[in-house]
Swiss-Prot record:
Biased composition range(s): Basic and acidic residues: 257-269
Stretches the record annotates as Disordered: 240-311
Region forming the signal peptide: 1-21
Name of the protein this chain belongs to: Legumin
Amino acid sequence: MAKLLALSLSFCFLLFGTCFALRDQPQQNECQLEHLNALKPDNRIKSEGGLIETWNPSNKQFACAGVALSRATLQPNSLLQTFLHQRSPEIFIQQGNGYFGMVFPGCVETFEEPRESEQGEGSKFSDSHQKVNRFREGDIIAVPTGVVFWMFNDQDTPVIAVSLIDTSSFQNQLDQMPRRFYLAGNHEQEFLRYQQEGSEEEENEGGNIFSGFKRDFLEDALNVNRRIVNKLQGRNEDEEKGAIVKVKGGLSITTPPEKEPRQKRGSRQEEDEDEDEKRQPHRHSRQDEDEDEKRQPHHHSRGGSKSQRDNGFEETICTARLHQNIGSSSSPDIYNPQAGRIKTVTSFDLQALRFLKLSAEFGSLHKNAMFVPHYNLNANSILYALKGRARLLYALNCKGNSVFDGELEAGRALIVPQNFAIAAKSLSDRFSYVAFKTNDRALINVCQKKLLQLLSIWKEMRPGSSSSTAPFHFLFHPAVTQTTKQQLDLVPNQYE
């Protein structure tokens, strides 16, 4: 009897497992892509202080990668209103400088502004908030799930921020459609129109998380008057100002003074970069590393690549470093004065990326320079062109078929699934891009090294074929072509 009961339970578990497998079956076929396209935003929502553009997350390419992409443009003296996300966005600052802040539940307000009291009995704090950070062009900002986020442009030039949202994150308990939960304002959802296409749902009238509450209830719950409740719910706005609003008179932020404005320092480096690289090869010095370390908190090195385990004294979420610069002005990981540079950031460099399970890569190529064929070992890659255009950008699927052969120009995005081989050649004086990776420790493998190994094995197995020329031809920048040919000749000679 006991054996019969155990056998029955086994069949039940097998039946349930089969049902769950059938339910997940459609998602397993989303990456059977025969053709890729360089996509541009297909939805635009204008606001008082800027606009937000989005790509369709239901597109087969984005569904394969499990991500959503958006681009926000903030005009001078404009504020991206506070919101929280059910997923963790990774934001790249394409252009501009400004401030951003996050509100972590349970963390104390450590920035306080003293003010003399009218009676002269000392000082009292009139304003306090959690830490506010300064961002600049080329920064990667990690926003943990459920954390309130805002951004402000205090400069005279627009700010352009590109955001990647991991729709397949394990922290998401809703469906795959991205949603922003705003805490203020009266505006519509950026991605909601994709969900409403083909349905007869009500028009998206906008609002925030307080709009549905009754005013009497909010007055008692928040201990505020009716005027503040109306502003909180956006009732006093004659028209929808949107998610980005103009700040009359500027925004007062309590921050420590800086010795030198970062935006001026970054702009000078970018202006001198082209001339320095053309005049002579740049020799990376310890002074450059020291300058970057001064701009970054010293606790950055505590979670370095020496150890993957926490020792109990790692940075807490309240004091975690949430942004790092990977732009042209930072020290590159790969550098060739005649070809270009590449800079990456992973959870080894920025520990906050562990919460997002995302990483990023910034690349800049000179004209006619090539990024050799390579593929991502453990991540999907979302390429977004920042400047210029690239030609001969190939992507090969598991069948060896070319799924993309064309140009990628500024403002367009291309999804490169895991293990799809890809190569790029710059057609502009400078082609720059940012690649979002769906792994906080993403790795790439260059196909050239694999070909060298295969060629060596082939020569070893067939010693008599050493006199024949190798049938492999690569397109490289002229400065490295001769070196590569020497490598191809030297490796087989070891087995002759």
